[in-house]
Amino acid sequence: MAATGALGSVLCVLTGASRGFGRTLAHLLCPRLLPGSTLLLVSRTEEALKGLAGELAHKYPGVRVRWEAADLGTSEGVSAAVRAAGELQVGAAQKLLIINNAGSIGDVSKMFVDFSDPKEVTDYMMFNVSSPLCLTASLLKTFPRRPDLQRVVVNVSSLAALQPFKSWALYCSGKAARDMIFRVLAEEEKDVRVLNYAPGPLDTDMHVVARTQTADPELRRFLMDRKEKGKMVDIQVSAKKMLDLLEADAYKSGDHIDFFD
């Protein structure tokens, strides 16, 4: 079990926080933060954010929990999230932690040849590629390098970043692009610790879409089989592993680490 406050005094920005892996991360992250730390929750869904923030504030009164309802699929949403973070005081924080968890699977009912509408592809890439790049870049400028502040960036990745899957053209390309973006960040900014973490197959809303709507019948059967045979990864176990990796701080910056590694 992780020691209380093991991650130190942290200013954390967590996207995609209102459900699934992000919500689980928020609950498991708070006890690892020292009192006085700040957690900014970002998601599209205002009511879910309010509820989560209330739960965390009640359970972990030492952590300042803030939230911002923002659609990261738009430039305005990215700007709103950056403004909300900029209003926070880094103060005595020892660490800036940016967790890029927000993402979508796209229309997996289509095969490659069905993507003939550039706007559909552009909108997908805006939310899944452009927004984490621009959000992270803006936050790193908002909280620049200083001797007493460690800056850490996490990209929630996937096996799909490394391996092609039929009918997942958008998802695979988006995840691959995100991995490379953050690998470049690791090369350019040597003081920033960067982790691409693939949490494994989780029983979330996204996986429901994948196993029911994927166009390729073989892949759809494979995903359904994993669910029926209980081969999904426990979401809390995966979130804990990610936080353990951050706590140990022994990974090579920019590396892609899978839950099964």
UniProtKB/Swiss-Prot annotation:
Known catalysed reaction(s)? L-erythro-7,8-dihydrobiopterin + NADP(+) = L-sepiapterin + NADPH + H(+); (6R)-L-erythro-5,6,7,8-tetrahydrobiopterin + 2 NADP(+) = 6-pyruvoyl-5,6,7,8-tetrahydropterin + 2 NADPH + 2 H(+)
Q: Which CDD domains match?
A: SPR-like_SDR_c (cd05367)
Q: Provide the residue positions that the database annotates as binding NADP(+).
A: 16-22, 44-45, 71-72, 175, 202-207
Q: Name one GO molecular function term.
A: sepiapterin reductase (NADP+) activity
Q: What is its main location?
A: cytoplasm
Please list the GO biological process terms of this entry.
Answer: tetrahydrobiopterin biosynthetic process
**GO cellular component terms, semicolon-separated:** cytoplasm
Q: What is its EC number?
A: 1.1.1.153
Classification via InterPro entries? Biopterin_syn/organic_redct (IPR051721), NAD(P)-bd_dom_sf (IPR036291), SDR_fam (IPR002347), Sepiapterin_red (IPR006393)
This protein's record includes keyword NADP: yes
Subcellular location per the Swiss-Prot or TrEMBL entry:
Cytoplasm
The alphabetical list of record keywords is: Cytoplasm, NADP, Oxidoreductase
Residues annotated as binding substrate are 158-159, 171, 200, 258
Entry keyword Transferase: no
The record, for PANTHER family, names: SEPIAPTERIN REDUCTASE (PTHR44085:SF2)
Q: How does it assemble?
A: Homodimer.
| Family per record | Belongs to the sepiapterin reductase family.
Q: Say what the protein does.
A: Catalyzes the final one or two reductions in tetra-hydrobiopterin biosynthesis to form 5,6,7,8-tetrahydrobiopterin.
Specify the protein name.
Answer: Sepiapterin reductase
Name the source organism: Xenopus tropicalis (Western clawed frog)
